[in-house]
Amino acid sequence: MLMSTSHTTEPQRLFGRDVTCIHRRSGERTAATVTCIRRGRGPDHAMQAPPPGTLYTLTLQVHGHAELDTTVNAATPWDALTTTREHLEQHEWFLAIAAARRDCWPIQLPRRHEATTVAELSDRRVPQHWQGFLADADPNDIGTLAEQQHRYQIWLSRYDTTSGS
């Protein structure tokens, strides 16, 4: 059994890095900094939900576009990233990261609340390729949340499975 090394209630950085942010219509590109911090005690092991009161705070700073900067609190890192992406989509901006690719989804989420990887949804039932949320992605592969969710539902129905399989 994997045990968490952090039982502290001090904020703990889970991930963060500089990424590329792209405007859908104009094609403008700019750097953005994404950071995710856990506030509260983490789960006792990887397959357990964090204790009540644990929040994940994702901060986005888009260089040269302060109007896009946001800070989001959510129950999981994926929820925080999803809410951040929704905010950007309203302004026609997208993050060029693996977590925004149409063909990627965090299928381990129901069992691993702190998961920070996405799987490529290929023609196999069990994904073979995993990437960190913030891994660089080809701008041609990124899409809206709706496109990504639609692709995931097609993948689920192809294998007659439920989310979390």
Over which residues does each language-model region extend?
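Long, contiguous binding/interaction regions
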Residues: 2-57, 69-72, 78, 82-86, ...
